[in-house]
Amino acid sequence: MSSPIKKVLFIEPRAPRPHIFSRVAIPRIGPVLLGTILERQGLEVKVIIEEIAAPDYRSLDFKPDLVCISSITSTAPRAYELGDFYRRQGLPVVMGGAHPSFVVRETLDHADYVICGEGDEALPELVAALNSGGDLGQIPNLAFLAGETLRQNPWRPFLEDLDSLPIPNYEVVHGWNARRGRRFVSIATSRGCPFNCRFCAVIKLFGRKYRYNSVDRVMEEIRQNGAKAHHIFFCDDNFTADRERIKKLCQRILQEKIKIEWSAQVRVEAAKDEEMMILMARAGCYCVFVGLESINPATLKLYNKSQTVEGIKDCVVNFHRHGIRVHGMFVFGSEEDHYQVIRDTVKFSRDLDLDSLQYLILTPIPGTPVYQELEAQNRIFCHDWSHYDGHHAVFQPRRLTPYELQFETIRAMKKFYSWTSVLKRLIARDWFYVKMKAGGRIQMWQSRWGKSNHVQQLKERLFSRVQQLRQWLPGSNYVPRVGIPADIWKLGPWESSHRDFLLRFLRHLGVEVVQETVVDKTENGPLSQVQAEIARLQEKADLILLPFWQGLEEAKQKIKDAHQQITHETVARLLDLEFSRESFYNACMELGLCFQKRLRRIRRIYFQTLAEVGAEI
C-alpha cells in the first residue's frame, strides 16, 4: 500500500429495479456492522445504503482509502460498476456478501479482494495486513489474484460468540439523520439454519447450526437502535427457531415497557405455539414474513419443506387471530409446477386473505443446490445477474415454458394486487397496506412489467425457435401427414409412455401420423434401420419428424447427412426435435406451435393427452 488505510467507504448497491418494498428502505445489517467494527478500531467510516440515499460519488466529500462493496446476486452488476469506478481512481476495492462468496473469479475482475462468508474477522485482518504489508495468504475467507493465479484461502470456523460483536452504529449511514420518523432498522439475533431448502444458500454462508445472541444482548440493541426507530426488522433467517428464547425476549420487552413495532421472518411451524404468538403480539409484532413456498405437495417435498397445505392455512389464520399481519412468499417454477398450480395458488392466496405477498420465480442463485443442478443440465439461459431477483425466469422449467412461467407470475401478481384488494383495505382503514397494495399496483403499471424487455425476449425466444422449425414445413403451415421412423425410438431411452404420449399428442393436434418400419432387420443396427425408414417415408409423408432424445448429436447428424444423399429433391423434409425428461413439455409446446397458433390450446391438448396416457411424463 502506498498510503495507510484511515478512511473506509462501505456501499450497499441499490436493487436493479423497483420492488414491493422500495418505499420501505430497510438497510442490510452487514455493511453497518462491519463499518462499526472498523470504526471501533479507530478508522473513519461511512456507509452508503443506496436505497436510503445514493450520492453522486464523483462529488462525495468523503475521500476513502479503501472501498468495501456488499452484493447479493441481483445487485452484482451495480456492485461491479461501482468497483470499476473506484479502481479507475487507483483505490483498492473489497467485495463481499452472498454473490461474491460463490462467484469469486468473476468478482475479482471488478475488485482487488473478495471476502467469502462472514467478514467480521476477515475484513479487520485484511485492513491490518494491507497497512503492515502482512501475508494475505494467512487470512481465512479471503480470495485475491496473485498475478493471474486465483488464491482462495480456506474458510474459517463460524464465529460462535455473537455477543462479542459490537452493536451496529446506524449513525455511520449516509443520510441517516434525515430519516427521522421514517427509520427502519435491522437487528440480527442469530445466524445459521439447519433446514436445507434447495433454493437457499444460507447453510453455505452461515452454517447448519444455529448461533444465537443472548436475550440481554438483543435487549441492549433494541434499547440503543430500536427505540429510536419507526420499525424494527429482525433479519434472522428463522427468528422463532428457539421458541423459548423468543418468549423470553418478548417478556423482557413487556417488562421493560418498550413500545416498538417490529416484524420478523418465521417458518409455518411458528403458528403452532399459542403462547409465543400471544407474547409476540403483545410485544409489538406487526407482521411476520413466512415462506409459504407452494400449495403443491410435490413441490414442497422437492424444496425439502416439511409443511402441508393445511399447515399453511392454520399458520395464516392463527397469526391473524392474534392481530399479526402475514406477508406470504410463494415460489413458482419447480420441476413439479405447471400453469394450473400457479392459478390455484392465486385463488388460495385470496381465499386465505393474506395481507401482502410476493409471487416469486424460482431463481438459481449461485451457491444453491438448484443452481448446481440447473447449470449441470444446461438449463440456465440468462446470466444477466440483475434478473436474478426472483421476478424473472432465467432457466427452462420442466412443465412450463420460460415465457409461460413469467407470464403466469405477472398475471398472479396483478390478480392479488388488484384495485378491489386496495378498496378492501381502505374500508378496513388499514392505511399501511392500502399504501402497499396501491403502491404495488401502481408500480406494476408504471414499470409496464408485463411488457418489459425480458418478457418480450422470452416470448421471442419461444416463437423464434418455432419459426426455425416452421421453415422446414412444406408450402403451408398445414401438414396433414407426419412420418416418424418406427425404429427411431431405439436410439434413446424412450419409454413406452413417452412414445405413446407423443403419438397421441400429434393426433390431437390434427396431424395424421405415418410410421414406417423396416421388415428386414438385417440392417446394421437401429441407425441404419432409421435411415432406411426415412427413405420409405419420402412419398408417404409431408414432413418427417425425428424425435431425438437429448445427447444423440452424432446420430442426428449421420441421419441428416444420409437423408441428403437419399434424394435430390426432398419430398418430405426432416424436422428434428430434442427431448429429455427436463425438456419434454417445452419440446411439445414448440412442436405444437408448428401446427397450432394458440399456446393455450396446445397446452390444453398436452394435459388432455397426459390424462389419457395416465403415466408420469
Outline where the language-model segments fall.
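Radical SAM enzyme core and accessory elements
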Residues: 2-10, 39, 43-44, 379, ...
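N-terminal [4Fe-4S]-dependent radical SAM core
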Residues: 2-4, 8-9, 14-17, 136-139, ...
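A short helix->loop->beta-strand "cap" motif at the edges of active sites that frequently abuts
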Residues: 5, 88-92, 260, 324, ...
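Glycine-rich beta-alpha loop elements in corrinoid/cobalamin-binding modules
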Residues: 6-7, 24, 34-159, 364-367, ...
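Flexible glycine/acidic-rich beta-alpha junction loops that bind and position SAM and/or redox cofactors
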Residues: 17-18, 147, 195, 244, ...
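Glycine- and acidic-residue-enriched helix-capping/strand-helix junction motifs
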Residues: 17-31, 491-498
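Short acidic/histidine-rich motifs immediately flanking catalytic phosphotransfer sites
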Residues: 61-67, 229, 285, 539-543
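Radical SAM [4Fe-4S] cluster-binding motif and immediate context
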Residues: 163, 168-330, 334, 339-340, ...
